[in-house]
């Protein structure tokens, strides 16, 4: 960021840990998410009327700062910002226990990511979770990529449209879910159950996806109700985590 750009933004007291969110869909989703604090909206003179109308019609209380397109390039480290950069807090995540206390729907689908570390994979999986009508995505407090602009962009802004939960000890959280009548399935290439064969009449299902390299941890596997697999060409070694998660969630979402 140039000194000129810093001077334009300094008066808004943006926290040091703020992230910038760029692109039309991610910016809109962030501005409408009550679990996020948005500080300022940076756009070009050409796009001012569009974004001004958007925040007025959606009753979003935020200041607009006009910048040149090249300045937005610098802020976002990208030339794919589409004329919009929003400075925001990270999403305020609920605890799983807090979410379950307020859970009223019998049919609930929860996705748990167990030590996935690639931001692009995590963002893509969150996007698929929203697309296939999952209700929440659980991220471990540790061994999970921090929320960044690239992760948000990879989710196409869907991270702001689905409930994001934070969990600690996974085995303990699995037991909490079981007490709330969730059936817990883990996606694993050595699973005995084909993903399309699970009983989807179970009202509450939690699906766990393991890390990109090692997959599910042994202790996690031992606490499952079942390990499920995706049938693929036997000459193909495996799918990557994001693709496998998408296929599994699609199958679970089918009636």
Q: Which sequence ranges carry the predicted segments?
A:
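Structured adenosyl-cofactor binding patch, chiefly the S-adenosyl-L-methionine
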Residues: 28, 33-34, 131, 152-158, ...
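Short beta->alpha connector loops at strand-helix junctions that form conserved
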Residues: 68, 114, 140-141, 162, ...
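RNA substrate-binding interface of SAM-dependent RNA methyltransferases
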Residues: 101-190
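N-terminal positively charged helical leader segments and presequences
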Residues: 1-101
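Short, glycine/polar-rich helix-capping loops at beta-to-alpha or helix-loop-helix junctions
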Residues: 50-52, 144-150, 214-223
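Active-site/ligand-binding-proximal alpha/beta "capping" segment
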Residues: 185-240
């Amino acid at each position: 960021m140039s000194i000129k750009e810093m001077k334009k933004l300094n008066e808004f007291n943006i926290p040091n840990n703020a992230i910038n969110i760029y692109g039309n869909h991610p910016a809109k989703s962030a501005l409408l998410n009550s679990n996020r604090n948005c500080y300022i909206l940076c756009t070009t003179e050409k796009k001012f009327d569009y974004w001004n109308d958007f925040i007025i019609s959606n009753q979003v209380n935020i200041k607009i700062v006009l910048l040149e397109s090249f300045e937005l390039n610098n802020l976002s480290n990208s030339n794919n910002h589409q004329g919009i950069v929003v400075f925001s807090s990270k999403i305020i995540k609920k605890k799983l226990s807090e979410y379950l206390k307020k859970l009223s729907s019998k049919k609930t689908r929860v996705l748990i990511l167990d030590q996935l570390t690639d931001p692009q994979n995590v963002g893509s999986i969150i996007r698929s979770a929203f697309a296939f009508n999952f209700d929440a995505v659980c991220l471990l407090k540790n061994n999970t990529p921090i929320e960044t602009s690239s992760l948000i962009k990879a989710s196409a802004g869907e991270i702001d449209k689905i409930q994001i939960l934070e969990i600690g000890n996974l085995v303990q959280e699995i037991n909490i879910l079981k007490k709330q009548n969730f059936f817990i399935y883990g996606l694993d290439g050595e699973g005995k159950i084909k993903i399309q064969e699970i009983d989807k009449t179970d009202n509450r299902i939690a699906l766990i996806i393991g890390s990109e390299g090692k997959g599910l941890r042994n202790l996690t596997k031992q606490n499952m109700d079942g390990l499920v697999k995706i049938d693929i060409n036997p000459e193909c070694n495996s799918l990557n985590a994001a693709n496998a998660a998408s296929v599994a969630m699609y199958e679970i979402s089918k009636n």
